Amino acid sequence: VNIVFSSRVPRECRSELEDLLFFNPRQHRVRDGIIDSLAHFGHPRVEETSSGLSVRVGDHEAQTLFAFDRDKKTKAPVGVVVFLRTSAEEIAIPHVAVDDEYALQGSEAGVGLGVTLVEKVKEIASRIVGVKRIVFFYRQEVVIRL
């Protein structure tokens, strides 16, 4: 598996991105966290920008990191994490989605893609002056200290 990361998705991958975000077959496992996140931040939506597709959450300006498998023929993402700065000291992760093949019991599970995406946000957060913690909403507001 050859995973790379980007903040944009090609426009032609809209339906695959929507499937990943909104119709993920494993989302029932974190249903309560999703409901909490939606109540707190609003609904995610796919938006077209001049450089491709991104994800917006409610009225918030969110950052999005997409994972792509270079070994796949498709340009569609295999994972996504949405995060935003909620205060001077905090970044929240309201949404994470991983293609079923890359989930814990999937055929490509060895990459630990969900954990890798959260770790990437942790790397980014550690470079932002003042940020001291990341709050992950899918697991009863897990707090990751930096």
Predicted regions and their residues:
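Glycine-rich acyl-CoA binding loop
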Residues: 106-122
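Active-site beta-loop-alpha junctions enriched in small/polar residues
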Residues: 139
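Non-catalytic substrate-recognition and accessory regions of acyl/acetyltransferase enzymes
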Residues: 1-105, 123-135, 143-146
